[in-house]
Design a protein with these regions (language model features):
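Bacterial N-terminal signal peptides
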Residues: 8-19
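Amphipathic beta-strand/beta-sheet edge segments enriched in Tyr/Trp
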Residues: 27-34, 38, 196-244, 343-348
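Short, well-ordered alpha-helical segments
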Residues: 32-76, 191, 242-249, 280-290
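Signal peptide-directed extracytoplasmic domains
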Residues: 65-134, 141-146
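C-terminal soluble interaction/assembly domains
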Residues: 225-239, 258, 265-349
Length: 349
């Protein structure tokens, strides 16, 4: 059984997460997915392409609900036609198992999402710090590369599958002195704040589970972002499925904040950026803006001292685009009057 609660949470990690930044990374494998296959036959490849495209659609939108979109569902049977390249790999989790990794056409995926009105979550995404405690045969310990490398690998795969950057604690002397297993499971606010503060991340996922004698797993996930907390209790058939629940909790919550239902028509927006003092600044601003899935073009219209005025051809309104831009901590919103721009920022080095 799974329950989900979202509410304002101002005590546990509140001070830490408000002060910390939503450090973001560019997800480079947004349009690729790896799925299992029985063999290398054309029939298996065709079936796998559909499965892989489902993963990509969910990754790009951030939410599994995108698969209920009629246009998205209608595109799945022809998935094989839109595979740019593929390769086979051994499945490290299944003896003798086989995986196929597929890369899909970026333009096909983005155009379909935009034309269907499905939400699009740009590749610039917040990094999540994960503390995970496992209990087996009465023994509790943090899950890390030494105690449970297979589960760590599963955690990495699930975050990659949902397109969310992952930060695992170092679990060195600094971490273990700041946070004990019991404190993590009890959500001890002071200890979690102290242990997490060194990583300077706004998004923290804390999980704890017990492995039962029949192999089933029972536990709970708590996801903190700023002053908000999401909670999910889960009973799963395996550790892998329990991990999937936790990662899904994060991805769905993030997508609700950052994914934008793009407009099929381009919107012309003027963006003012102050603090541009070198060609490197100039190129950095323009190239980053053009890397956003919701921005078709970013053309510099004028340069006045250290301020540039950029004309954006975007598939989102100004307020929607501002939500995405806030993830770049070098672009700080500023109140500017008399400039005639829809968006105003300071380029902070």
């Amino acid at each position: 059984m799974i329950t989900l609660v979202r509410r304002s949470f101002g005590i546990v990690l509140g001070l830490l997460l408000v002060a910390a930044s939503a450090r973001a990374e560019i997800v480079k494998d947004l349009y690729s997915a790896e799925v299992p296959v029985a063999d290398q036959s054309p029939a298996q490849l065709a079936s796998a392409s559909r499965d892989a495209l489902e993963v990509v659609f969910v990754k790009v939108s951030g939410s599994s609900s995108v698969l209920r979109n009629p246009a998205v569902a209608a595109a799945l049977p022809s998935a094989r036609q839109h595979v740019q390249q593929y390769s086979y790999n051994k499945d490290p989790g299944v003896p003798g198992g086989l995986l196929v990794e597929m890369l899909f056409e970026r333009s096909f995926v983005n155009n379909l999402m935009i034309e269907s009105g499905a939400p699009v979550w740009t590749a610039n995404r917040p990094t999540v710090l994960v503390w995970l405690v496992k209990e087996e045969a009465g023994v509790q310990q943090f899950v890390n590369a030494e105690t449970d490398p297979a589960l760590v690998a599963q955690l990495r795969r699930e975050f990659s599958r949902r397109g969310v950057p992952l930060q695992l604690p170092l679990y060195d002397l600094v971490d273990t002195a700041a946070l004990s297993v019991d404190q993590a499971k009890a959500l001890n606010s002071a200890a979690l704040e102290q242990a997490s503060s060194r990583y300077q991340l706004q998004d923290v996922l804390v999980g704890g589970f017990a492995l039962q004698s029949d192999g089933r797993v029972a536990g709970k996930w708590n996801y903190f972002s700023g002053s908000d907390r999401s909670q999910r209790s889960a009973t799963a058939e395996s550790e892998a499925l329990f991990v999937r629940e936790g990662v899904g909790l994060v991805a769905e919550a993030m997508a609700a904040r950052y994914a934008v239902a793009a407009s099929a028509q381009d919107v012309g927006l003027a963006m003012s950026v102050t603090g541009v003092t070198s060609y490197a600044d100039y190129a950095g601003v323009v190239s980053w803006l053009e890397s956003l899935e919701l921005v078709e073009r970013a053309d510099v219209e004028s340069v006045q001292g250290d301020r540039i005025l950029v004309r954006l051809q975007a598939q989102a309104a100004a307020d929607q685009l501002a939500t995405v831009i806030e993830l770049n901590k070098q672009l700080v919103p500023i109140p500017v009057t008399g400039v005639g721009a829809d968006l105003n920022y300071l380029w902070q080095k």
